[in-house]
Amino acid sequence: MKLLGNSKYIFVVLLLCISVFLNGQETLDEIKYSEEVCTEQIDIHILLDGSGSIGYSNWKAHVIPMLNTLVDNLNISNDEINVSLTLFSTNSRELIKLKGYGSTSKDSLRFILAHLQNNYSPNGNTNLTSALLVVDTLINERMYRPDAIQLAIILTDGIPNDLPRSTAVVHQLKRKHVNVAIIGVGAGVNNEYNRILVGCDRYAPCPYYSSGSWNEAQNMIKPFLTKVCQEVERIAHCGKWEEWSECSTTCDEGRKIRRRQILHPGCVSEMTTPCKVRDCPQIPIPPVIPNKIPEKPSNPEEPVNPNDPNDPNNPNNPNNPNNPNNPNNPNNPNNPNNPNNPNNPNNPNNPNNPNNPNNPNNPNNPNNPNNPNNPNNPNNPNDPSNPNNPNPKKRNPKRRNPNKPKPNKPNPNKPNPNEPSNPNKPNPNEPSNPNKPNPNEPSNPNKPNPNEPSNPNKPNPNEPLNPNEPSNPNEPSNPNAPSNPNEPSNPNEPSNPNEPSNPNEPSNPNEPSNPKKPSNPNEPSNPNEPLNPNEPSNPNEPSNPNEPSNPEEPSNPKEPSNPNEPSNPEEPNPEEPSNPKEPSNPEEPINPEELNPKEPSNPEESNPKEPINPEESNPKEPINPEDNENPLIIQDEPIEPRNDSNVIPILPIIPQKGNNIPSNLPENPSDSEVEYPRPNDNGENSNNTMKSKKNIPNEPIPSPGDNPYKGHEERIPKPHRSNDDYVYDNNVNKNNKDEPEIPNNEYEEDKNKNQSKSNNGYKIAGGIIGGLAILGCAGVGYNFIAGSSAAGLAGAEPAPFEDVIPDDDKDIVENEQFKLPEDNDWN
């Protein structure tokens, strides 16, 4: 911790870190690899069993060949593997010493093994301990190479003579870093002992022990060869890298490369790493909208379809004036040389055509070319297409086609390219057969052939039967044929004025009887449906204004059908019994005690101008509400008196002259059965309660002695906080002097009992006692403070109460105070 607090130490550590970092940048790249190395410096000590248990045959056939295999697989040299050989039986003998003959050369070692195979015969016992001690002596004398690995290989077929001694020497060699391996050959090998001798567990795998028959001796040596030739991890320096090249791209992510020369086969000569210089500018993405623009013109091509009906090539549009076939039509009737003119007037077969039974109606029409009834043909309901043919002459075909495309379809089903229905030269005879006009008929307006227009595209098969038709002499009749004078029969064209029977055709206005579909206007008699205004007959429902006849509900005033009872509008709510009497006589107050609260007074009997005469009322009989003069008055239930501290008692009415006072009034109010209210301190009348069992008498009370009004005056309720039991009204008789008030001692005593006594005396006494206590406390505190301060100043002054104790007794007292517990008498 002290070092961490030392700034110099921290500075030195920082410098070391920087230097290591800089040196690390200059170090060559290194790679780690492993390879099998058999040329390491190893000293192999071979201990060969030459006891008689092996036998000469095994010695010659198996033992010596196994040693030759081991030598052949080792890299024996002066610097790498050195070999020593010791033969043990009863005694041990070192055949090859380390760094001696045959120790560093394979050829020398093979020669020794061949001589041993031919000249030695196994004999004696197994003295393994003596051979182990030879190896131990080499280690102790440092006859080995300190950098070399020490390995001892034992070849035996039996159990050593001294097991404990042999085991002890093996452990001693292991402590000196000598590895021991055993190869057991033959039938008498003790495997358990050999495993313990090597240092392996009894049942665990042991790499330093191998056993088997003599035939397997050469195979058993191979595991030991792997121990000698081990894989060693090595580090190779691959060389220094060159500088990094520039990034492969000028923007965004790229790669850079560096190279070096190969110094080892496992090294890499080239290295790449990602790099990034800067972000590349974003390339604007072409808008997608221009790609959609060519698709949009395809939409306008859709309305091209409505123009298809106006296509001049449309064969279904007979009304197109631009029909290229029409201009050739007018030339056909003007051609006098036309041999195919079916309208030859000399044609005798034409009259037979009207006999065509397939069209019985057509012969009637051509017989009268000027038939004014032709205009009625458009009215033929069976052929509504007829009126459509003349109309294209007078109407705009473009206007008519969209409105009625269907009427135009029947004529175009069999269009005639030679049809003179060209609007430029109308044929006056077309109305003769408006159903199927024949372009060649105008040549003979007088005798049209109705059957020819039945198939205008194909000539009448009867025409070739006309012998006169090839005769051109009739063609001079074509002077008639050039019925151009008949073209002035265009005056017959004014028969088109008959065609303006199309005004009858505007019987289609009868078709616009679809306006009669606005008979829905009759349906939209919804104007009549706005009879919903009649539904708002709810205005009649707003007869609810009659419902607000709820003002008639205030007919509840009529509910008090007792007009006599409400005849006194001044009668108050019967729930307030005290107030209803006030309006009864506003001039003279009424004593509420004289009234029976249980018997409501009749407002009709009360006279606001006259006081109530108690004699006129029958005091003996209670007022019966059923005896009221007006039977319509509904009497209220009797109201019991209630306590109301806010009500000021009203002085009684003093009867005037002519009024008799009841004679049964007591002279002293205390003797009366009537409970007189007495005010409390709070201003409440304690006697005016529901618990009172006394009632106002209904019988006349005898008047007192000389003063007939005294008894009545004694019934006056006492005002609030008054000590007088008798209060006289000044309005009784102003001439009479007020009588002296007689106090009631009993009432005073009762009132004083209810009042709480004043606590002022206790307050004064408490104040005096508190003051004295404060003074006493102040004096005691002063004496205590003065005594303690004086003792501190005086020093060795006597303690308090010390002068009280005699001098002779002071020592005794002090001794008594400082006695030990065991010295006490009570102990």
Curated annotation (Swiss-Prot):
<feature type="transmembrane region" description="Helical">
    <location>
        <begin position="764"/>
        <end position="787"/>
    </location>
</feature>
<feature type="disulfide bond">
    <location>
        <begin position="251"/>
        <end position="280"/>
    </location>
</feature>
<keyword id="KW-0812">Transmembrane</keyword>
<feature type="compositionally biased region" description="Pro residues">
    <location>
        <begin position="408"/>
        <end position="464"/>
    </location>
</feature>
<feature type="domain" description="VWFA">
    <location>
        <begin position="43"/>
        <end position="228"/>
    </location>
</feature>
<feature type="repeat" description="2">
    <location>
        <begin position="614"/>
        <end position="624"/>
    </location>
</feature>
<protein>
    <recommendedName>
        <fullName>Sporozoite surface protein 2</fullName>
    </recommendedName>
</protein>
<feature type="compositionally biased region" description="Low complexity">
    <location>
        <begin position="465"/>
        <end position="567"/>
    </location>
</feature>
<feature type="disulfide bond">
    <location>
        <begin position="247"/>
        <end position="275"/>
    </location>
</feature>
<feature type="repeat" description="1">
    <location>
        <begin position="603"/>
        <end position="613"/>
    </location>
</feature>
<dbReference type="InterPro" id="IPR000884">
    <property type="entry name" value="TSP1_rpt"/>
</dbReference>
<feature type="region of interest" description="2 X 11 AA tandem repeats">
    <location>
        <begin position="603"/>
        <end position="624"/>
    </location>
</feature>
<keyword id="KW-0732">Signal</keyword>
<keyword id="KW-0677">Repeat</keyword>
<dbReference type="Pfam" id="PF00090">
    <property type="entry name" value="TSP_1"/>
</dbReference>
<keyword id="KW-1015">Disulfide bond</keyword>
<dbReference type="InterPro" id="IPR002035">
    <property type="entry name" value="VWF_A"/>
</dbReference>
<feature type="signal peptide">
    <location>
        <begin position="1"/>
        <end position="22"/>
    </location>
</feature>
<keyword id="KW-0472">Membrane</keyword>
<dbReference type="InterPro" id="IPR036383">
    <property type="entry name" value="TSP1_rpt_sf"/>
</dbReference>
<keyword id="KW-0461">Malaria</keyword>
<feature type="compositionally biased region" description="Polar residues">
    <location>
        <begin position="657"/>
        <end position="671"/>
    </location>
</feature>
<feature type="region of interest" description="20 tandem tetra-/hexapeptide repeats">
    <location>
        <begin position="402"/>
        <end position="514"/>
    </location>
</feature>
<keyword id="KW-1003">Cell membrane</keyword>
<feature type="region of interest" description="Disordered">
    <location>
        <begin position="278"/>
        <end position="761"/>
    </location>
</feature>
<feature type="compositionally biased region" description="Basic and acidic residues">
    <location>
        <begin position="709"/>
        <end position="724"/>
    </location>
</feature>
<feature type="compositionally biased region" description="Basic residues">
    <location>
        <begin position="392"/>
        <end position="407"/>
    </location>
</feature>
<feature type="compositionally biased region" description="Low complexity">
    <location>
        <begin position="301"/>
        <end position="388"/>
    </location>
</feature>
<dbReference type="Pfam" id="PF00092">
    <property type="entry name" value="VWA"/>
</dbReference>
<keyword id="KW-0748">Sporozoite</keyword>
<feature type="domain" description="TSP type-1">
    <location>
        <begin position="235"/>
        <end position="281"/>
    </location>
</feature>
<keyword id="KW-1133">Transmembrane helix</keyword>
<feature type="region of interest" description="29 X 3 AA tandem repeats">
    <location>
        <begin position="306"/>
        <end position="392"/>
    </location>
</feature>
<feature type="disulfide bond">
    <location>
        <begin position="238"/>
        <end position="267"/>
    </location>
</feature>
<dbReference type="InterPro" id="IPR036465">
    <property type="entry name" value="vWFA_dom_sf"/>
</dbReference>
<dbReference type="GO" id="GO:0005886">
    <property type="term" value="C:plasma membrane"/>
</dbReference>
